[in-house]
């Protein structure tokens, strides 16, 4: 998969949440692997939602700008520390006086990837995705990476495979392209998972399960054949299971360094912004998740 000529490269949205620091580190390493720029963005909303019409004193706006510059400086240090062998990527930074979601959605038109933490500084107890990450999953013009605020518990996560969900949809085809590209750049294996039952049909009578399994395995092999030729250096493990895709992807994410899913699966309908599988995996997988949104421009 080509990284294209998107001028902003990889964009990472930053705030003072724990997940933002992890997001910066992941984005910096991915930008280094791709040899493309990294853009750090901190959005400062000039308005505060309140039922009282109280004007903000000038000191608050100045504090917001100073706080944003402090966050950018901290993020730049993370980028330097995250560097692998090739050296840190070219970094641009912006403090934008506007709401985060519309700002990042608009900037995503010129990005290869959009990277954000799962929960921002306005996190609510019990929530799994924040308003910014949820908004980008539905409206971004490029693939979105959701980062959780903890590092992998695996002893050698850099050696773990990339996991991709394959279901035959157009979004799944984009996810497959991204997954092969990431596995190739990271020099790791790829696990391609096809879970072919969104509902529990184990008790349905008259279904020839061995024949259905064999057919699903053949379909998966055909879906991957062209990509194997394009990326001969990537070793592939094909997994076909009779189970719900989201459950399998979340379970198997514990042994992967990255999960890639389509924004809408084969059950998605016209106008659907993000599918249930993509959203569930983004919420529950503890490893970074790329939701392969297609460009809307």
Curated annotation (Swiss-Prot):
Family assignment from sequence similarity: Belongs to the universal stress protein A family.
Function: May play a role in the establishment of a persistent infection (latency) in the host, as strains without this gene are hypervirulent.
Other observations noted: Was identified as a high-confidence drug target.
Keywords: ATP-binding, Nucleotide-binding, Virulence
Organism of this sequence: Mycobacterium tuberculosis (strain ATCC 25618 / H37Rv)
Annotated Gene Ontology cellular component terms: cytosol; peptidoglycan-based cell wall; plasma membrane
Effect of residue 15 to E: Reduces ATP-binding; M.tuberculosis overexpressing this protein grows normally
GO term, biological process aspect, one: response to hypoxia
The protein, known as: Universal stress protein Rv2623
Xref: CDD domains: USP_Rv2623_repeat1, USP_Rv2623_repeat2
Residue intervals passing through the bilayer: none
Organism superkingdom: Bacteria
Disruption phenotype: The deletion strain is hypervirulent compared to the wild-type strain in infection studies with outbred Hartley guinea pigs and with C3H/HeJ mice but not with C57BL/6 mice. No phenotype when grown in culture upon disruption, probably due to functional redundancy among paralogs.
Pfam families attached to this UniProt entry: Usp (PF00582)
SUPFAM superfamilies associated with the record: Adenine nucleotide alpha hydrolases-like (SSF52402)
UniProt cross-references to Gene3D superfamilies, sorted A to Z: HUPs (3.40.50.620)
Induction line: A member of the dormancy regulon. Induced in response to reduced oxygen tension (hypoxia), low levels of nitric oxide (NO) and carbon monoxide (CO). It is hoped that this regulon will give insight into the latent, or dormant phase of infection. Induced in mouse lungs at the same time that adaptive host immunity induces bacterial growth arrest; induction is dependent on interferon gamma.
PANTHER family documented for this protein: STRESS RESPONSE PROTEIN NHAX (PTHR46268), UNIVERSAL STRESS PROTEIN RV2623 (PTHR46268:SF27)
Binding residue positions for ATP 2: 165, 198, 262-268, 276-278
GO MF annotation list: ATP binding
InterPro entries: Rossmann-like_a/b/a_fold (IPR014729), Universal_stress_UspA (IPR006015), UspA (IPR006016)
Binding site for ATP 1: 13, 43, 117-123, 127, 131-132
Subunit structure: Homodimer.
Lineage: Bacteria, Bacillati, Actinomycetota, Actinomycetes, Mycobacteriales
